[in-house]
Amino acid sequence: MKTSIFPSGHEITILADGSKLQKNPDGTKLHKFPDGKVVQYLAACVLTMEPNGVKIQANKDGTKITTYVDGKREQHNPDGTIITKFPDGAIEEKRVNGDVLLKKPNGTLVQTMKDRSVVTVYVEDGRQEHKFVDGSVLTVWKDGKREQIETDGTKITQYPDGRIVQVDTDGTILESQAPPAAPPK
C-alpha cells in the first residue's frame, strides 16, 4: 500500500489489490479498480461505473438508479416503486400495490391495475378506454359521449345531450330521448 498526498489536499492510495483510492479535500472519494470499475463516493450518493458501461447511483435516501449502455434507466425508490425510462422515451412505473402505469412516447397513458383491468388515455383525442377483467369495455370521449360494450356484445351509448341508445346482440334498438332543456329563467 502506497499513499501520496498532494499540495491540493488530494490523497491517492494504491492498495494491495492494485486499486487506487483517491480522497478529495471536499470529502468525496474515488475508487478505481483494475477491472475498470469505478466507484465514486459523493456527499449525497455512491456512484458506481461498471466496466461494461452500466452506471449505478445509490442515494442516501435509499433510491437506486441504474443506467444501462442502451440508455435504459431504472429507478428503485425506497417505497418499492420502480420507474423505468426506455431509450424510446416511454416511461413505466410499477407501483407497490401491483398497478403499472406506462406513458408511451406519444403521450398515451396505459394503466394496468392489479386486477388486470386496463385504462388507456389517448393523447391525440383525449379518449379514455376502460377494459374490465370481465371483458366489458367503457369508452369516454372528451365531449362526454360514453359507450359501453358488455361481454354479451350489447352496446350502450350515452350522448352528451343525455340521450341513450342500447343495441342488443339480436339487433333490438332501445332509445331514450334527451331530457328536455331547462326553461329559461
Model-derived features with residue positions:
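Repetitive, compositionally biased segments used for assembly/scaffolding
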Residues: 1-185
